[in-house]
Each structure stands twice: as C-alpha cells, then as structure tokens.
Amino acid sequence: MALQLLPSTLSVPKKGSSMGAVAVKDTAAFLGVSSKAKKASLAVRTQVATAPSPVTTSPGSTASSPSGKKTLRQGVVVITGASSGLGLAAAKALAETGKWHVVMACRDFLKASKAAKAAGMADGSYTVMHLDLASLDSVRQFVDAFRRAEMPLDVLVCNAAIYRPTARTPTFTADGHEMSVGVNHLGHFLLARLLMEDLQKSDYPSRRMVIVGSITGNSNTLAGNVPPKASLGDLRGLAGGLSGASGSAMIDGDESFDGAKAYKDSKVCNMLTMQEFHRRYHEETGITFSSLYPGCIATTGLFREHIPLFRTLFPPFQKFVTKGFVSEAESGKRLAQVVAEPVLTKSGVYWSWNKDSASFENQLSQEASDPEKARKVWELSEKLVGLA
C-alpha cells in the first residue's frame, strides 16, 4: 500500500497567492490506498503518526540476504511537481524498477494521488505529500512533515515549474515574489537548502540533487535565442524582492513584465544554483549536483497557458520539423537516468540527449554558467527566503 501524508489542518492561502491550493498547517502520516488504510485515515490527529513501512524492505533500512550479506536498500527520491508531465513520468519510471520509493511532492494532493493510480504506480512504491512552492511556509512545513515520516532522503529532484508565456502583468506568491521566479527558483532554493541536511545524513552510496533546467534559458542554442532571451542583467530586480510594488517584478529590473522571459530567467537561476551547490558542497559531501534538459516535451501541461494555436501547432512542429519532440514517457526515463544511473554521477553537469537518446554533457551559455553571477543569485536568494 502506498504511504501517503494527508493534511490534518487546512487553511486558505495567504492573500496574494494565485495558486489556489489550500496550505497545510500540520501534516499527519497515514496509509492511504487500501481499505485498511482508509479506515486508519479516519483517526486524524494534529500530531504526526508514524506509518507502518509501506514496502517490504523499508526505504530507511538495509536488508540481509540468506547468505547474511547486506543488500542495498530501496532509495528514496523526492520529486516536486510529480502529479503530471515530466515529474509523473519520472516517478513512474523509478517506481517501476522496484529500487526506488518515490515521494511525490505536489501542490494538489488529490490530483497527485489520482495521477499515480492512473499511471499504474504500484501501492507501496510512492508517497504523496503536500508542497506548495508558492509559499515558503509550505516549503518549511513539507520539510518538517518529511522528517516526521522518518524516511531517508537519497535524491532530491527539483522539477516543478509554472510557465505564463502570454502574461503581461505579474502575479505573486504568498510571500510577495513574482510567481514564476518564486515557484521555479526561490521555492526550490529554500527546499534544497533545508534538505541538504537530510541528503548529507543519507547512507545511500550515490546521493544526488537534480534541478531541471531548460534549453530556453541557454542562449548558446537556437531555442535559447528565440525572443525574449533570458538575461538576469545586474540582478537589481531580484535584489529588490521582485515585488513589483517598489521596484521591478523582473530579475533584471525591467519595468515592463514579460511572462515568457520571467520563466526563462527562472531557469537560468536554476542552472546557476545547481553549479553553486556543486562548488560549495560537492567536494565536502560527495553529493552529485546536476541539471538537465530532457528534450522538448511539446505535449506537456506546462504549455497550458499558451495560446490555443501554439498548443495545436507546436507538437507537430517539434515532431516533423525540428525533430526535437520527446514524449513524456521518454523524458521521464531520461530524468530517471540522472537520478539513478551509475554512469551519470559526475557533479556540476548539465545533461542533454542526442537524437539517438544517448546522454551527453551539454555546454551552458555564459549567462547560465557565470560563477560570480551564481554567487550573487545565491546570496540574494538566501535573503529572500529568510536564510540570511
């Protein structure tokens, strides 16, 4: 049966958040798939209950073989935004191996639960937990709830993202930051910083942190040069908090808002953050830090806010003209490779795949690999999420 973490106390999000999801004030662990689990879930408490092990070999323990030799335990991977698209496909690919227990960290708990069922993920192979990256309080609550569940953390995948390509006015997170950068970068930045402690405690032989990038934020590619191009400028907008009230909602400080550029800029921040994690922590901890572009998933729900004509024409254009189209299932397998494959353990790498689906180390643009800019993004982000 699949271990799930259900909210025991719910509240309306803070004024200013447009995500529309309830925020978890406290979280309790329950078994939530079998009929026994449903009965158990009636005993909702405000305190966290430790659920029985959802798998034969607990994600937190190492079993012994008949010969007495220890065998590798199941790995535990947290994937944000795992209720659809790339995240769900990767969760399914990893769960199907039987070697991974997947924590699906999602804003919409019920949607994620239904998606896992619809994808055919086996009971006991996953845990659904509430996480709203548009609220820094929710990020902290998720970390607390995850620790109360007493699972190890072996791999963290920062995948969730929002994309508002036609937006000409900004929306804001519960903390007052522009939504695209707030969710795609700042929420993940806080999550990753807080969970570093858990990654460092893991006894798993190959601990990893994976941050999903995008070709659109990499200006040394054709796609990265499609206007508006990603550019962080001097970061004065980020330094001002991206509030739009007393300054700009754009990272580079531009007074006019462009939703497509805000997304691209957020992905540059993702790739810079990965490299800064690598510089600060890899040598000391041995943790692998990497990013990736799995290919153009032209049918993903990420494009749901684009104009209808684009949604109609973009998939066949990618399939038959650019030849860059990748299905959600294939993209999920590629992300799963970065999570689990022994050959992809090099740290500080931005992974891509060629037309034969072979992985390779891709080259990042100057904008997405500038170490000084990465340091500044890190330090400004620390202030915005309350770590400095």
Curated annotation (Swiss-Prot):
Compartment(s) where it occurs, according to its Swiss-Prot or TrEMBL record: Plastid, Chloroplast
Enzyme type, top EC level: oxidoreductase
Biased composition (Low complexity): 48-68
Alphabetized UniProt keyword annotations: Chlorophyll biosynthesis, Chloroplast, NADP, Oxidoreductase, Photosynthesis, Plastid, Transit peptide
Gene Ontology MF terms: protochlorophyllide reductase activity
Gene3D superfamilies in the record: NAD(P)-binding Rossmann-like Domain
EC number, as in UniProt: 1.3.1.33
Function: Phototransformation of protochlorophyllide (Pchlide) to chlorophyllide (Chlide).
Protein name in the entry: Protochlorophyllide reductase A, chloroplastic
